[in-house]
């Protein structure tokens, strides 16, 4: 039977929620990943160092006994951020600030209205070596939802990089050929995370034969040519600029199967297996370890994990749902098969 042993991966973009939801989902990530970069879009958002440290304590309390998993904490960038906050964050071990353009995604109402007013804050991030994580979509209602990432590149990303050229930027959960091209052409201070869904699915998987609410995420799934461009990027000559970030975003089944359903796909349960499928299909299984376990750590300036995990070429059936607080949670590929299984 085919096996693949890799350095334990890290999830560089993860939503863990809070309360009972946190307790339900944290063990899935802790089982596979050594570390994860934790998104700060709680209600209310994680905007201060005190907020982040308190949230980290709640995450640690939700982990299985004996778990070595380490959450890497971030702050939610708001219009009120200051250079002093950046210095405080650095001193407290916060790894990054996250940009949510106001209204772009789940719990983004506190997001930034004009990023260019925060240039002194971004300059301090560059000085302190704190990363700038970007949800790269414009929120202009006149821009089609399928074009919002591409529009963001010209309107925001390129001008910001021109003004703060040494800022370390992660273009999060990229979905388009344009975003991949920006990262490929930018300096080594610019990298990107890519989700399993944007490597495996296209917008037909969302809309053909009926609306598939469990395939609805933001940024929304794009056409097949974009999916192919992402696969080419993560397996190509400059693959070191791309790394694993699931954007696993749990929502109760009732909130997804809804007249106004929430955006987000829960993939943490079988994340590395889904990525293995991508790299296998691309004939690039030898590049999975760098994507999952090396590139992100290098970009964040942290050591690689010292232990390993082993994947076996053995099919598994994903559960139709799993418990989630008072409700249930539908994982990515619920009821379907994945060709790889982690040996636990």
From Swiss-Prot:
InterPro entries: Amidohydro-rel (IPR006680), DHOdimr (IPR004721), Dihydroorotase_CS (IPR002195), Metal_Hydrolase (IPR032466)
Pfam families for the chain: Amidohydro_1 (PF01979)
SUPFAM superfamilies: Metallo-dependent hydrolases
Sites where the protein binds substrate: 15-17, 41, 135, 218, 251, 263
A cellular component term, taken from the record's GO annotations: cytoplasm
Enzyme class: hydrolase
Gene Ontology BP terms: 'de novo' pyrimidine nucleobase biosynthetic process; 'de novo' UMP biosynthetic process; pyrimidine nucleotide biosynthetic process
Keyword Hydrolase appears in the UniProt entry: yes
Function of the molecule: Catalyzes the reversible cyclization of carbamoyl aspartate to dihydroorotate.
Protein name, UniProt field: Dihydroorotase
